[in-house]
């Protein structure tokens, strides 16, 4: 007799190497808790509907709980010949409790069973990711709150552009992560749907109660169409997209951490606990954690592209191609959760070199726009002011000094309206004070921004 759940139809059994290719148990045992949770809800409902006896239901539930316990104690070894987590659990259940275990699959298919597992798993992981994003955001707010008055050069094209508050700069990533968090939150509406009871594709002739299993499994709603319930993995694609976009934001932040920690910048010093060294160069301290996060975005985006291509041409209902939805999602979830934890620890323990940052903006031309704006206050058209300042900057470069070093007489050679107050006007801290537009880098605006962020975190 075949040990396959579908063996009655077949005269020849697959060889072991074919079983290995077909099996998913090496990775889908990740779903054991979700599979057992779904099975307990199904067994409870079957008994309540009079489809199986209460005694059989109780035996099934106790058997499932014992399997779950023993699995987590490393006392169960699953078999590739049984293909997947569903059939391995069912086989073990029948071995433990006898014929009652064979009644569990009444009114259910592996098609709706695996869909239920994946919905439960994805929901839990998205909730975990949201919590990790919020935790990282909280650290960003703490760092920003302590650096409202720390000034640094802002960049465009990776060239110094205008002085900005370090707090304003780092809060940029708070808002990127806030949108990421919102995307995950919104996606829960499309993840938190119960497919259990859809069976293979057309529902079942048994008088099941899908509303009961929806409540037992704490789903927010249930699929209205049984074929849709088992056919799509759009919620996995959406989750992979949200993971990938969040990883893109972490990658951009990581790139800045890497640059800031260079000897050329020296804006920050990373903790030894989040750095590594070189096997040949004794002096090296490498930002490997940031580099790994920067690199892993390719991994998660690859999983997204893979899943899109897997679903692209599939006919409706279950196809074995859908087995490919798991490893990519599991790995992407593991990757982003690890990346968020590492990033939080990395920035929480880094040292911000405030003196270096404040000095840097006095050794560049990031206050050149301020000089142009100063001329505009003297009723000079901005385009004319831009031309004048460009010539002054060129002279400074040729002579090896900065705008604060230019003698007043030289300024007045370029335009007679420039007075001695220009030196206060060009001080970096005064450049920031004049930025009062909503969402700008001025102190009052940054403090207001932080207040909004703290309110969001408290919700």
Curated annotation (Swiss-Prot):
Q: Name one Pfam family in it.
A: Lyase_1
Asked whether the keyword Transmembrane is assigned, the reply is no
What subcellular locations does the record give? Cytoplasm
The protein's matches in InterPro entries, at most eight in alphabetical order, are given as: Arg_succ_lyase_C (IPR029419), Argininosuccinate_lyase (IPR009049), Fumarase/histidase_N (IPR024083), Fumarate_lyase_CS (IPR020557), Fumarate_lyase_fam (IPR000362), Fumarate_lyase_N (IPR022761), L-Aspartase-like (IPR008948)
Major place of localization?
Answer: cytoplasm
Single GO term (MF): argininosuccinate lyase activity
Which EC number(s) are documented for this chain? 4.3.2.1
Q: What class of enzyme is it?
A: lyase
Task: State the pathway, as annotated in the record.
Answer: Amino-acid biosynthesis; L-arginine biosynthesis; L-arginine from L-ornithine and carbamoyl phosphate: step 3/3
| GO (cellular component) term, any one | cytosol
For the biological process aspect of GO, one term held by this record is: L-arginine biosynthetic process
The family this protein is said to belong to: Belongs to the lyase 1 family. Argininosuccinate lyase subfamily.
For this entry, the protein name equals: Argininosuccinate lyase
Task: Cite the source lineage.
Answer: Bacteria, Bacillati, Bacillota, Bacilli, Bacillales
């Amino acid at each position: 007799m075949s040990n396959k759940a579908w063996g009655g139809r077949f005269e020849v059994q697959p060889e072991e190497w074919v079983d290995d290719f077909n099996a998913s148990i090496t990775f889908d045992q990740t779903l054991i808790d979700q599979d057992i949770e779904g099975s307990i809800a199904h067994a409870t409902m079957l008994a309540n509907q009079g489809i199986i006896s209460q005694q059989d239901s109780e035996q099934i539930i106790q058997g499932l709980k014992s399997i779950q316990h023993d699995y987590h104690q490393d006392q169960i070894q699953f078999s590739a010949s049984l293909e997947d987590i569903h059939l391995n659990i069912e086989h073990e259940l029948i071995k433990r409790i006898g014929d009652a275990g064979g009644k569990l699959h009444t009114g259910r298919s592996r098609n709706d069973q695996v869909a239920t597992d994946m919905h439960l798993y994805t929901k839990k992981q998205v909730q975990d990711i949201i919590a990790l994003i919020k935790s990282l955001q909280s650290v960003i707010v703490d760092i920003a709150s302590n650096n409202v008055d720390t000034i640094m050069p802002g960049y465009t094209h990776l060239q110094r552009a205008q002085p900005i508050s370090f707090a304003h700069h780092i809060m940029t990533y708070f808002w990127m992560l806030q949108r990421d968090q919102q995307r995950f939150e919104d996606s829960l509406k499309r993840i938190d749907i119960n497919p259990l009871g859809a069976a293979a594709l057309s529902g079942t002739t048994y008088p099941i109660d899908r509303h009961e299993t929806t409540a037992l499994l704490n789903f927010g709603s249930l699929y209205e169409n049984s074929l849709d319930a088992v056919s799509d993995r759009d919620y996995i694609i959406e989750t992979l997209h949200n993971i990938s976009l969040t990883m893109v934001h972490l990658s951009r932040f990581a790139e800045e951490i890497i640059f800031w920690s260079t000897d050329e910048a020296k804006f920050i010093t990373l903790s030894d606990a989040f750095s590594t060294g070189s096997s040949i160069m004794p002096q090296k301290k490498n930002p490997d954690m940031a580099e790994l996060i920067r690199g892993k975005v390719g991994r998660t985006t690859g999983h997204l592209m893979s899943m899109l291509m897997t679903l692209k041409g599939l006919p409706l209902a279950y196809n074995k191609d859908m087995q490919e939805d798991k490893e990519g999602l599991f790995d992407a979830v593991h990757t982003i959760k690890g990346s968020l934890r590492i990033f939080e620890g990395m920035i929480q323990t880094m040292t911000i070199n405030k003196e270096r940052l404040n000095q840097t903006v006095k050794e560049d031309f990031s206050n050149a726009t301020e000089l142009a704006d100063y001329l505009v206050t003297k009723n000079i058209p901005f385009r004319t002011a831009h031309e004048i300042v460009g010539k002054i900057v060129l002279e400074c470069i040729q002579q090896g000094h900065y705008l604060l070093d230019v003698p007043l007489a030289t300024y007045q050679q370029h335009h007679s309206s420039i007075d001695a107050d220009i030196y206060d006007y060009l001080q970096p801290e005064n450049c920031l004070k004049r930025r009062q537009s909503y969402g700008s880098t001025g102190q009052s605006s940054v403090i207001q921004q932080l207040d909004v962020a703290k309110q969001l975190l408290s919700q």
